[in-house]
Amino acid sequence: MYYGNMKYNDIANGIGVRTSLFVSGCRHHCKGCFQPQTWDFDYGKPFTKEEEEKIAASLREDYVAGLTVLGGEPMEAENQEALYPFLKRIRQEFPDKSIWIYTGYLWEELTAEGSESVEAQPAEGSESVEAQPEEGSESVKAQPEEGSVQTEAQPAEGNSQRIFLEHRRYCRCRWTLPLLRLIDILVDGEFHEAEKDLSIRFRGSRNQRLIDVKESLARGEVVLSEFMYKEGE
């Protein structure tokens, strides 16, 4: 995996002072994207153990609230494979720090039992990451368990997220659920230039959602984070 930038003392991409990692590689190509150079999977520098250590060192500061991963697209299958062992380490070493991920994919795409699965492929010329999902965690498969009923995930009525049902995309892989279990907040949805709103917190456009990952996984439905709304809204 490559990354385009690391920001320390970032206050724009999540609650509190944060360290932010901008990974490379994105297939969304949103109109109005603020950093289209990160669409290229080979943009920037390789994300190595040295970069991991720099981020870990920054999180040891008491005033740093947590880590945010954005891009680019962290939830491209190639990036999920590289991020899983890193975020597992961060969660183990810093259990009191929050982890946020920004993705153009939808929660429904990442979690629906009936969604297609794609195998992560390393970028050409890069080494494959041999990390394994957490012991005891479920492997994410495209097919439901034998005897279970396959259901179609439905977006909220009237929600612009219905693009999920019309143009299903390939983002779910063996790393997806193990990775989601490590994070606190998922900001989902592509940037929509027509819905751009500079007044909202931690989002570029109104279609995007701040999802409480732990509550959503526990309930089996999207639970919006309290951070979704600005004060007084």
Question: Positions of the model-derived regions?
Answer:
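P-loop/Walker A phosphate-binding loop and immediately adjacent motor/lid segment at beta-alpha junctions
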Residues: E195-E233
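Short pre-active-site segment immediately N-terminal to redox-active cysteine/selenocysteine motifs
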Residues: G25-H29
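N-terminal [4Fe-4S]-dependent radical SAM core
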Residues: M1-F22, Q35-D42, V222-V223, F227
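Long, intrinsically disordered low-complexity tandem-repeat segments
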Residues: S115-G158
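Structural recognition of alpha->loop->beta junctions
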Residues: E116, I163-E193
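Conserved Radical SAM active-site core
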Residues: M1, Q35-Q121, E157-E166
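Short, cysteine/histidine-rich loop/knuckle motifs that typically chelate Zn2+
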Residues: G32
